[in-house]
Amino acid sequence: MSKPIIFLLTAFVVLTDLGATEDTEKVEVKAKPSKTSRGAIGQGFELHKIDLLSKELQGTGAQVFEELPVEECTTDNKLGTIQKDDTFYSNTESLYNSVASNSKIEPSLKGPFTLGTSVGAVTNNIVSEKSEIQGLSLNLKAYSMIHALKQDCINKKPLAKDLVSDFEALDREVKKPWLKPSWRKYKVFLEKFGTHIVRETMSGSSIYQYVFAKSSESFKQRDFKIKACLSLGGPTQVGKLGISACSDVSKKDVEESSGKEMVKKLVVRGGKSDTRVDLTGELSKNQINKFLKEATTDPSPIQYTFYPVWTILKARYIGKEHYAKATNLEQFYKGYLNFDCAYEKSEKGLELQKFELAEDSDPDAPTYVCKLGPEGCHSDDDCESDDLIYCACCGDSCIRYNNTVLLSTGDTKKVAFINDVDDEFRDHGCGRKGLKCKCKEENKKWGQSWSGDSDADAALRDINAMMLDQNRRDQAKRHHVKKGKSLH
């Protein structure tokens, strides 16, 4: 049996608008690592359906491994640190960056599909791709321990029997991949076992006070800080919370803040459940400090990092016939779901967007692209006279591209639409034929807005091809020897 290939996750740093870090206090952690402090480590969850910011993941995730012996497969390190700081989110992208960075989710997944549930939970769903938001969080954190799943166990420990049987039963070739029903089995697999496992848990106790508003309100960073401090402690306790960010809030600040409407969200995690119940409304310094100190004796998870299920499967099945299914799973999630390459047609039945195999896709390690219908005219009816010289593409089958800026990522997404309004979209296949404008040079070349190919994927495909070729030769040799023995 070939040795499993070990995949290393590349650490990435995403910049957020951090406020001044306050005093860090060292404390002695008396608690010992436990099932409670480790939480849902090693379990599978659908990342796009869970709230990573305001809810604690219950230990009821999917079973991905047959077993993960604690002593053999986890590392437990005590931290013993209380830290108080604040984070300013200057725009929508910085908020998404923060969530992705803290959860160690790859940058390509930091958009609204994968992280929208989490971001919506603390912003009261005022986030959209059409309007920017700004905000701030007061972060009061007591870190007790960090628990991590060892990479060797991720790569070698037996996978759950039903996961293996369900995975190997998936279609190797997905026919008509642009149609959502074609991916039904893959969708069911992700729903059952999750898109990611919990790789690490940070235990302790934490209090986060979030405040947000649409950027159009033109609030300053200090406005958000004052509102967060008032939301946490109220007008009478705001300067007595033991938080330096709130120490200079004046009576005038309190009065002016009352007229500034913002979305507020208090998130309390970790510590004792009985104490958490009491931490509602306006808090006092004693309440805050008591709860943070509970991290030393009664820690529970306050932060999680994740690892993709398809990365686990690619490591297990590289060089085998089922490897194609692992890449299918990854590309379905990243391209069809997360990038939103759903099948789109115009009212006249013209294909605008289509999820399809790349032209040079390897059947043993498929890669997909998000294709856009050929830009320009597709009928003489699309072409009309712009003036005495030029023709313009404007009609029911005139396809035009537009680059849309995604506020959640800062990236641009190329989209195709029917241009039946702008009669100054000159040329694009339209030209003069006598006195009339005709579709003289119809474009047949499809555009592309997303590709599942990367340098890392190319390297893995090469390794998979070499190992698969060797395995097939070995299998043919064994078959030949067996056949020879049967003849004698």
UniProtKB/Swiss-Prot annotation:
Gene Ontology biological process: killing of cells of another organism
Cell compartment(s), UniProt: Secreted; Nematocyst
GO cellular component: extracellular region; nematocyst
Pfam families reported for this sequence: MACPF
Domain MACPF: from-to ranges: 24-344
GO molecular function annotations of the record: toxin activity
Domain EGF-like intervals: 369-398
Species, as recorded: Phyllodiscus semoni
Keywords: Cytolysis, Disulfide bond, Hemolysis, Nematocyst, Secreted, Signal, Toxin
Role of this protein: Causes lethal toxicity to the shrimp Palaemon paucidence, and hemolytic activity toward sheep red blood cells.
Annotated protein name in UniProt: DELTA-alicitoxin-Pse2b
Disulphide-bonded residues: 370-383, 377-391, 393-398
Stretch forming the signal peptide: 1-21
Database matches in InterPro entries: MACPF
